[in-house]
Amino acid sequence: LKIGTVHQCNCCLGSKTLHPLVSVIDLSKADLSPHTDIKFGFYTILLSECKCEAYAYGHQYCDFSDGTLVCLTPGESISMKENNKEFPSKGWILAFHPDLICGTPLGLNIHNYTFFSYCPEEALHLSLREKQIILEFLERIRQELERCIDRHSKKIISKYIELLLDYCTRFYERQFITRSEVNKKVFREFNHLLDNHFNVKVSLSTDVLSDEYCANLLHLSPAYFNDLLKYEIGKEFKEYIQF
């Protein structure tokens, strides 16, 4: 299922269009086939409040279980069939078009929110308090959308989204803390990979030995892999191997 605009998203998920570029959608009211694969043409923040394995993207033993957050860039898909997942029957979607944040501080800095480049299996798993904070911002945005659109709407809504993303950054950093032992294991596997490469002298160029190449061997996205390295050792891939 390809959803190109915020209005189309509202139509597919049974929500009213209060603004053509942004929407907060209650998934409990959505009428969508459980195993539908969806490609979104805009930024999408998906909050699942379902506490079951069918929605637990990458959930590990050391993670909280009160909510799961997945962030998608325009043109990205979320696959239900491939991962044997179901579209959440309880939760929320924040959908916003790039035009909404064009010319705003958020528009200039959204590339800094690297979790938009994580894969769904690297989702953020929220505590109850963290989920409540996310829901509070979604409610603020929803209330602003209930007002008539005026010259202040874009600035206020984009600021709320920016603050929400700042909290997501904080919560992801907390997740790196609670996953400390898991991450250390990944780091050891990475060093073992480097040892094999340099000691065995496999005929690979430095172009092949990239963050993308190593992340793929570790079953991680390059963005998550680099953020994990930054948290564990304070350096990204290229700094660590000193190219």
Over which residues does each language-model region extend?
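Generic protein-terminus/edge-of-domain signal
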Residues: 1-63
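Short beta-strand His + acidic residue motifs that chelate non-heme Fe in jelly-roll/DSBH
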Residues: 54-56, 78-86
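Short acidic-glycine-tyrosine-enriched beta hairpin
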Residues: 59-73
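Histidine-centered metal-chelating micro-motifs
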Residues: 70, 75-81, 101-102
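A hydrophobic/aromatic-rich effector-binding and dimerization subdomain
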Residues: 83-147
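An amphipathic alpha-helical interaction segment
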Residues: 132-192
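Short helix->loop/beta-hairpin flanking segments within DNA-binding domains
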Residues: 192-207
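Basic/polar phosphate-binding segments, predominantly the helix-turn-helix DNA-binding elements
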Residues: 208-243
